[in-house]
Design a protein with these regions (language model features):
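Intrinsically disordered, low-complexity sequence elements enriched in Ser/Thr/Gly/Pro
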Residues: 1-2, 42
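A detector for short, charged/polar N-terminal pre-domain segments
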Residues: 3-10
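A structural motif detector for beta-strand N-caps
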Residues: 11, 16-19, 23, 29, ...
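Right-handed parallel beta-helix/beta-solenoid
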Residues: 26, 46-53, 74-76
Length: 87
């Protein structure tokens, strides 16, 4: 499920990426090419800092986020997952 965060940001998913229908992606997320996001994974970038700013969660090309993984960025925290990474 791809959904907006309270600020209105929608994930950007490369056309070659695969997101399992049971996975949840919410907010300011950038998913690179040939990324695999497995069943029941949850990736949330939905908290802003006191100035309303939010850094994205970025998943580099050719990475895979396996079944049931949860990634959540807190306000003011940047999450960058490099290329060819498996979590």
């Amino acid at each position: 499920m791809i959904r907006r965060n309270p600020r209105g940001d929608l994930p950007v998913v490369h056309e070659t990426a695969f997101v399992d229908p049971t996975a949840i992606l919410c907010g300011h997320i950038i998913v690179g090419e040939n990324v695999f996001i497995g069943p029941y994974a949850v990736i949330r970038a939905d908290e802003v800092d006191e100035n309303g700013h939010m850094d994205p969660i970025t998943i580099g090309a050719h990475s895979n986020i396996q079944d049931g993984v949860v990634i959540h960025s807190k306000a003011g925290g940047r999450v960058e997952i490099g290329e060819y990474t498996s979590i």
